[in-house]
């Protein structure tokens, strides 16, 4: 019965534009989260990673709940961890609509959202409310941080430092998103002096906080072997706490979305994401955690 109901709901949602469906899902999850009582993740294979006790290893990646509006509702679904964001210091509308495209025959989506979000002030307020209610019993909450579109690349690291300072007391872990393809120039922060300056600055910011909160970096699936190995070298050198592989890809199968700009996710990304995960696993210290995303 549950499967039949899900298929019917899916059919109804697919009659609506993708972004409308997404917003409707967030609204529904907010209602679910407002139900009384404590909220616990489904007990699965418990892991202690990043110094945190994960009740199960299945998490929700950033990008779904950009503004931490539905954390409690999502937690009711049983996730071991939920990553909210990407959030930027100042609110921004993102790219022009339409900017989200479904390809159900390929089990894929292309998006060029552009870090649309309500800004850090709004998310701090949301997370403060969640912490004050104290209903999440074991669900790990991470915050994914990005730079504003109009922040020059040479000052981009400042936006990430602001995020570390704003969310250090509210997040269980923090993710540095330097791999979205939908913010001009952002991926260059994965290379050369940009990466080294970034890691040096954020680790210094992390060390200044009263509480140690793990810092992870989210990487692109489109890195070549040389760039990936360089990232691993610097991640190890600066003792970053973990890596998330991967963000969306700019590559396209020949029969999918050739005319749409943006990042491709879903089944066509799986193999590429898996190869990057293997590459990072073989070049990082065995104790460096990797979160697998994509596909």
Q: Which positions does each model-derived feature cover?
A:
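An N-cap/entry alpha-helix motif that binds or orients negatively charged groups
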Residues: 4-48, 111-116, 120-121
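Conserved, mostly hydrophobic/aromatic
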Residues: 17, 60, 82, 123, ...
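Glycine/Thr-rich beta-alpha phosphate-binding loop at enzyme active sites
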Residues: 26-33, 37-40, 181-194, 228, ...
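Short beta-strand/loop segments at the ligand-binding rim of alpha/beta enzyme cores
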Residues: 51-59, 136-143, 207-223, 280-292
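Active-site beta-loop-alpha junctions enriched in small/polar residues
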Residues: 63-65, 87, 146-150, 179-181, ...
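A gly/proline- and charged-residue-enriched helix-loop-helix capping module
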Residues: 85-137
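Active-site-adjacent beta->alpha loops and helix N-cap segments on the catalytic face
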Residues: 90-99, 121, 134, 182-213, ...
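Active-site glycine- and acidic-residue-rich loops that bind
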Residues: 148-160, 188, 217-236
């Amino acid at each position: 019965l549950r499967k039949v109901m899900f298929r019917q709901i899916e059919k109804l949602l697919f009659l609506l534009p993708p972004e409308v469906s997404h917003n409707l899902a967030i609204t529904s999850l907010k209602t679910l989260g407002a139900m009384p009582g404590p909220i616990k993740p489904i007990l699965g294979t418990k892991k202690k990673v990043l110094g945190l006790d994960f009740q199960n290893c299945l998490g929700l990646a950033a990008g779904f709940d950009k503004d931490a509006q539905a954390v409690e509702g999502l937690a009711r679904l049983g996730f071991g961890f939920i990553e909210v964001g990407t959030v930027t210091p100042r609110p921004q509308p993102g790219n022009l609509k339409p900017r989200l495209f479904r390809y159900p025959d390929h089990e894929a989506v292309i998006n060029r959202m552009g870090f649309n979000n309500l800004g850090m002030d709004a998310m701090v307020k949301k997370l403060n409310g969640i912490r004050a209610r104290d209903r999440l019993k074991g669900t790990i909450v991470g915050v994914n941080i990005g730079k504003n579109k109009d922040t020059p690349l040479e000052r981009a690291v400042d936006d990430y430092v602001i995020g570390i300072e704003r969310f250090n007391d509210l997040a269980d872990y923090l993710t540095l998103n330097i791999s979205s393809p939908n913010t001009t120039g952002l991926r260059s922060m994965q290379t050369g002096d940009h990466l080294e300056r970034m890691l040096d600055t954020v680790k210094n910011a992390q060390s200044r906080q009263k509480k140690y909160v793990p810092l992870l970096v989210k990487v692109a699936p489109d890195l070549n072997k040389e760039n990936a190995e360089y990232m691993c070298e610097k991640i190890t050198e600066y003792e970053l706490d973990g890596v998330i592989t991967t963000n969306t890809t700019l590559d396209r199968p020949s029969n999918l979305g050739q005319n749409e700009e943006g990042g491709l996710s879903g089944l066509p990304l799986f193999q590429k994401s898996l190869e990057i995960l293997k590459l990072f696993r073989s070049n990082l210290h065995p104790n460096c955690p990797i979160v697998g995303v994509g596909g």
